[in-house]
């Protein structure tokens, strides 16, 4: 499962019922049609769970029953596309969400009431990421979070929403639309907090620290003396084993005393055994630290 999907699944698990979240999803993925009964609304997504979330938002907030349709893409990816189709109270819903103008091309940006309210901004950003958000895998070392908009005005308003939370958001125009993006790891982690993806933020930070620790070890291997290199080699083995434990059963599954040593080793890959011992909440002998590290390595070997 990609990290983007993990974030979206966590957001869906929040079971939010916020009109501003729905507003973003309709604005970014919706289209209008005409039928004999009046206006129709279609909101498309390639994620079945997001389609279900849209269905439930419309039902809970406006007491309407939409229809979830699907078809297969004809390109090589062959992803299934889901459409949430509604032909009841469409004009009333658009008016309530202040979306009618944007659909008729008069206003492509975000409603001022959302732009000036923190909670509304959080919900709107959550809906925007669910609709058209994506992230690079955090362990790739090239950090980027993007949200694709049809119009540049909307992309710039999204950036303004992010800046309300002190995020260094930027925009760029591409062939398929305009992109609002973040490139600093700290901004991406803060964005995940803003939209409520706390578990994803914690995992992102852990992967980031792990990668930085490995990079520090690689640099140390090239620059330090033979004695330090031996320490680094042992540290590298332990960090790789900690990464293995994190990927398979989670560091939190370790006993508390081993968790503390594991976190210290990740945060300080260049520390000697003595430095690790001195940094523990309850100072330990070198022999005691070595014993705990051997336990960690043994647990990893048994996975």
Curated annotation (Swiss-Prot):
Purpose: Involved in cell division and chromosome segregation.
One GO molecular-function entry: DNA binding
Organism: Streptococcus sanguinis (strain SK36)
A GO BP entry: cell division
SUPFAM superfamilies, sorted: Homing endonucleases
Superkingdom as given in the UniProt entry: Bacteria
Pfam families given in the database record: HTH_WhiA, LAGLIDADG_WhiA, WhiA_N
Record-given protein name: Probable cell division protein WhiA
Family, similarity comment: Belongs to the WhiA family.
Listed Gene3D superfamilies: Homing endonucleases (3.10.28.10)
